[in-house]
Every structure is written in structure tokens, then in C-alpha cells.
Amino acid sequence: MTSLRPFTCDDLFRFNNINLDPLTETYGIPFYLQYLAHWPEYFIVAEAPGGELMGYIMGKAEGSVAREEWHGHVTALSVAPEFRRLGLAAKLMELLEEISERKGGFFVDLFVRVSNQVAVNMYKQLGYSVYRTVIEYYSASNGEPDEDAYDMRKALSRDTEKKSIVPLPHPVRPEDIE
């Protein structure tokens, strides 16, 4: 049976099989440690019965309560290829949403490559909608052009009027994101 548990420092040396996916954003060890130190409850790993890491979600709480922008943010969600199509990503998202709800968030948001239609469709099935397009959010390699992202959001119960998910009428640039 799969177990979902808090991510630990030791997991940093065990999750390469998950991060080898070209659509997964990878970061340096200090970045992961910062999340682990500041938002440990938002950093969850799925582990197979034999101890193999199957996937993880890394997020944080951010924004302004006064402006009704306090929310959970999904920084990274990735499942190893051999464990996809089992509902694991949906379960990890559900856990992060529950944590954000308990922390009084108005919504949960994430960024996803416009070209990653499989992920976009999954997020839509989970109740997320495109809030805005962010032009050239993802840096490209090999001389390719930078790629746009969708900022997708799902309102939580605190946002009774669903104001947080009203789409913006125009795209924005990365420097315009607060």
C-alpha cells in the first residue's frame, strides 16, 4: 500500500527517479531545504511498500490575508513514470488543498507549461481553471524560445464569492506576478 508522509532530508538523495522527467522543474538542494524548513506540511512524498519514492508535492503558503490573496501554492508536483495514471497526483493535490484550507487560504494556485496538455487536463478535472497566461515563464534550453505558463487556480471554501478565480482578460509577464 502506498504511504503518504512528510518529505524528509533523506528523501533528497532518493528522488532522482522522479525528477528525471523533462517536464519536471528541478532545483538545487538549498531550494528544497528552504521549503522543507519553512513549509514542511506542504512537502509530501508518496512511498511504495518497498520504500521506492513514487512522487512528491512541494508547496507553500503565501499572499496577503487583507487583500484576500492568502493561498496555497504548488511549486512542484511530480510522479515517477512507472507510477502515473494511478491517481497519485490527484491524491497529493488533495492533501495540499486540505492543508491550505486548514491554514485559511482563499485558493490554491500553480503554474504549468501551456504545452503540457496532460497536466492541464488533469488540473481541470481536479477543479482548477486558467486564471491567467504568463508569457515566457519557463526558460528554454538548446536555443528554443521560452515557454508560456498557465497560472491555474482553484477556489477554497473561504472564497465564498469565488473572486480569486475570475480570469484576467490579458496575459502578464513574470515580473508582473506578485
From Swiss-Prot:
Q: Which GO terms describe its cellular component?
A: cytoplasm; nucleus
Region (Disordered) residue ranges read 159-178
Start and end residues of each N-acetyltransferase domain: 2-157
- Where is the protein situated, by its record's location annotation? Cytoplasm; Nucleus
Principal place of residence? cytoplasm
Q: Per its UniProt entry, what is the enzyme's top EC class, as one word? A: transferase
Please provide, alphabetically and separated by semicolons, the GO molecular function terms listed in this UniProt record.
protein N-terminal-methionine acetyltransferase activity
The catalytic activity, as recorded, is: N-terminal L-methionyl-L-asparaginyl-[protein] + acetyl-CoA = N-terminal N(alpha)-acetyl-L-methionyl-L-asparaginyl-[protein] + CoA + H(+); N-terminal L-methionyl-L-glutaminyl-[protein] + acetyl-CoA = N-terminal N(alpha)-acetyl-L-methionyl-L-glutaminyl-[protein] + CoA + H(+); N-terminal L-methionyl-L-aspartyl-[protein] + acetyl-CoA = N-terminal N(alpha)-acetyl-L-methionyl-L-aspartyl-[protein] + CoA + H(+); N-terminal L-methionyl-L-glutamyl-[protein] + acetyl-CoA = N-terminal N(alpha)-acetyl-L-methionyl-L-glutamyl-[protein] + CoA + H(+)
CDD domains found in the cross-reference section: NAT_SF
Keywords, ordered alphabetically: Acyltransferase, Cytoplasm, Nucleus, Transferase
Give the multimer and partner information.
Answer: Component of the N-terminal acetyltransferase B (NatB) complex which is composed of naa20 and naa25.
Q: What is this protein called?
A: N-alpha-acetyltransferase 20
State the taxonomy lineage: Eukaryota, Metazoa, Chordata, Craniata, Vertebrata
